[in-house]
Structures are given as C-alpha cells and as structure tokens.
C-alpha cells in the first residue's frame, strides 16, 4: 500500500503543480492565460499594425538568427543614444537588457571574447511584445488588453533608467516613441480654471529633451530640463522630480513647473490632473515616480525666456597622488559655488580622472542676463587666489552666449564602445555646507570614492528657487527643499548585474537594490499618502515600477506578489522548466 501511495502522491502533487492558481502572478507565455495568436492579431489590427513581436536588438548577430548586413548595422548603431531611445528592443543602460547571468544575454558583435555566431541569443529582460502607440485610444486599448490578460506591463520612453524600469521578463511594452506632439501656449489656462498661468508648452509622452530644446530655439523659449538630450521630457525625469544641474537653482525642479497632466488610468479612462481636477493624482505625479500611477500621455510645462548668459569655467588639475587636489582644490571650488550662489549665480562642479595618473575638477558658473565678459572675469579672478596659493594648476575660460539655449545639447550622445553605467546619488544639505568645516568635510568624503578613468562625479545645484518653492506641495522627499546639492557618481561598468552601485537619494539615479527606498525617496508621510493614492487609481497594481510605490508587494521583476505560497512558487518553477524544454 505504501508503495502505491508514493506514485499516487507524486501524481497528485504533479497535477496540483500543473493547475495551481496563478492569480498572484502576471500571466507568462507558458500558461494557458497567455494571449493567443488571434488575441495579439486583434490588438495589432486595432492599432493599424503597430504591435510588434520583439527580440533583443543583437539577435541578428547570433546563431540561426544571424544576418550579416543587419548585424553590421547593429554594430554601427549600438553606441548611438538617439537610436537606442527610439528602438523598442534596446535600453540606454545596457546592463538592464540582460538577465542575472551571461546565459540570459544577447550581446552585440563588438563585445570582446563573446562568440556570437555559435551562441544563442537569449531574451533576457527585453519585453516580448511592443505596442508603438500613436494616440490616446491606442494607449487605452493596450491598457485594457494588459488588464484583461493580466500581463506584466512596462512603459518605455527613452530607456534612460538606472534600475531597469523600462523592461521586465515576459512583459508587454508600450512604447511612447511616436507620441511627439509639441504645442506652445502664450498663456496656458489649465482645465477647470479661468486663470492663465503664462507661457507653457504641452509635450507628448515621447518627446525627448533635445526635441523640445530644438523647438525652443526656434520659438525663443527654454524649459527646465535635464542635460542629457535623449532623456524623455515627460517620463520618469519629470514624474520623478526632474533636476537640472544648473537651472534648478534659478527655476526650481521640473515638478515645480508642471501645470497639467493628461493620464490614461489603469481602467483605461483618460483623465486630466492639475490643481483643479484630480488633485491627488496631480500631487502623486509631481515626484511619485514614472510608470506607477498611470500612463502620462502628455504634460504641460511652464516655459522661460531664452535669455543671454555668460558662462565662466574654472578647471583644476593635479596628480592622483596629490591629496591637496581634494583637501584644498575641491574644497575651494565648493566654497566658490557657495559664494556665487549667495549672489544668485548657479554653478556645477564636475570631477573626472582623465588619465590613470591625474585628476580634474571643473566648475561652471552661469551668469544669466549678463553679456559683460570683462565684469564676469573680474568677479571670478577675485575669488581664485586661494587656489594659486596652494600651487594647484588652474585655468579659466569665460564666454558669452546670446541665448541660454546655446548651452543645451540637441544631438544624441555617442557612447564609448562596451559602455554601460550605474549611478548613485546623495543630497547634501545647505546646513552641512555652511558649517565651519562643512566644505572640507564634503570634499574629504568625496575623495574616498574610487573614481575610475571612465567615471564622472558631478553636482546639481539646488537651493535657490528649489528652496523658495517650498510652498509648492510635491511628493518628493521634503529634504529636497533643504538641500544645497545633489551629488551623483556615474560609473562605467560591463553589462553585468554584479557591479551595480548602492546608497542614493534621487530615484531617477537610484540604487536598484535600495532596501529603504520608501524613506530615501519620499519619506514616511509622503509614502503613506502616495500608497493611498496608488490604491485608489491603480487598485490592481497594473502599473508596477521597480522600487516604485507599491513595489514592496511584488518580487524584483514585478511578476509575482511576495505573498505567493511555496506550492505556487514551485508550480511556477516547474511550468517554466517545461516551457523552456
């Protein structure tokens, strides 16, 4: 009898594993809930043929998928940031295209030591399908489809992300790359209001920074945007807070300047969020993070005059072994920033290691509405004497730009070969820098960070208007209103999981393994409020973003809820193995 019970128990257990409920997980390709070919075809037809089945971009360089001409094209284009931004098969930070191991990867042909023709291309974290939406009705159709089939939904804007939020295994992607509307308003009146808020621009979800900058050049305006030209203007940059390294000091954060959102919610409704309508959603989208509360189809943002600016640059250089580079040089540059901030002049400090034997730090100051080059030179030189006393090599350059937009980059970046990045950042409070030894303390701490030859460390100047806008209620951590700088370290890495960094405060440049993300990014009170708004607008958590509001309820990839039982987890593993085989 016992001999019989063994096989019967195994059969019963196997039957249970096969048919165990998967309601706590998103549907995956090996499960019966996965959309049929007919389902995908119907969605494609409703979108005028803009649904595509995708493979990693380098698949044409591997195994049976190899195509010589297509592979050569990938090798040529793979370093182009603009190409990566518009391509649903790629991300900017390449490390997030792969899985946890090299066996879950699909590298391009230029990667050294990798045998492409004889190796298979693995999907990794690249979604299985991408919908290239062209209208709000397309977005609504995709949201309904994802809801109906319980799919893991991801949104790809430009793919700039330090935690891989634009992709996930076995997922369905909505790409914003065709939503390029740009409309300029002389005096924007938000819906539900009778009062104009001055000049503004409405941007579609797929507009990149360089595109709105170029439009601004033609129409004599600028916006509060980031420095990287291929970052999306409406996506996670804006919804995550939006920091400009130079302009935030005089114009605030991006979320301080957004006037209205148009949002497709998780039940596929199209709603407006501003100070008059759906105020809770408006608050959440002003710092609560992208891809979390709904699909932002467009946003309207305040614009500023394209005024002249005089840019003054001071560069110091020293040998790596010269400790005075940090203790005196960098410390003095921080003092200079503080001095000019007190005169309402913003600045950014950038530290690099141009060679293995040398260090370099550059301070760039922006004198707005100033064209008197001689005056700026005198102001700068009057503050540089301490650097010369310490025999630190110093050079300066002052140049006048007729328009502030001349300083904005309107060309996509070209990355170095085999280049991937991780980033970490931390806020430095104004109170810390104003202490007697505050600048020395910060310089000393920065000197302890290992800076490689392809790494870059830079400050984003806060304070100023960011502090003055304290009355504006946003969902970012309250510490932003008290900070003097955001300090960011960007490190070059190979595309592997193991080299990812830690310890940050800005979600847009955050640690993908941050355990205390709720407190670090938003603070206890703000997070509780955000969680309640998330529960109202997205009760089934369709919009799930890594280290985003509500993500603590899910596994790392947003596939299964953490409350999934042992039996259900084992069932999922067995199904996956059968699907692979």
From Swiss-Prot:
FAD-linked oxidoreductase; part of the gene cluster that mediates the biosynthesis of fungal ergot alkaloid. DmaW catalyzes the first step of ergot alkaloid biosynthesis by condensing dimethylallyl diphosphate (DMAP) and tryptophan to form 4-dimethylallyl-L-tryptophan. The second step is catalyzed by the methyltransferase easF that methylates 4-dimethylallyl-L-tryptophan in the presence of S-adenosyl-L-methionine, resulting in the formation of 4-dimethylallyl-L-abrine. It is an enzyme of class 1 (oxidoreductase). InterPro entries: BBE, FAD-bd_PCMH, FAD-bd_PCMH-like_sf, FAD-bd_PCMH_sub2, FAD-linked_Oxidoreductases_BP, Oxid_FAD_bind_N. Pathway: Alkaloid biosynthesis; ergot alkaloid biosynthesis. One of its GO terms (molecular function) is oxidoreductase activity. Residues 1-25 form the signal peptide. Its EC number is 1.-.-.-. It comes from the Eukaryota. This is FAD-linked oxidoreductase easE. PROSITE patterns: FAD_PCMH (PS51387). The keyword Signal applies. It holds the Pfam family BBE. The lineage of its organism: Eukaryota, Fungi, Dikarya, Ascomycota, Pezizomycotina. Transmembrane segments: none annotated. Residues 122-306 form the FAD-binding PCMH-type domain. Coiled coil: none annotated. Belongs to the oxygen-dependent FAD-linked oxidoreductase family.
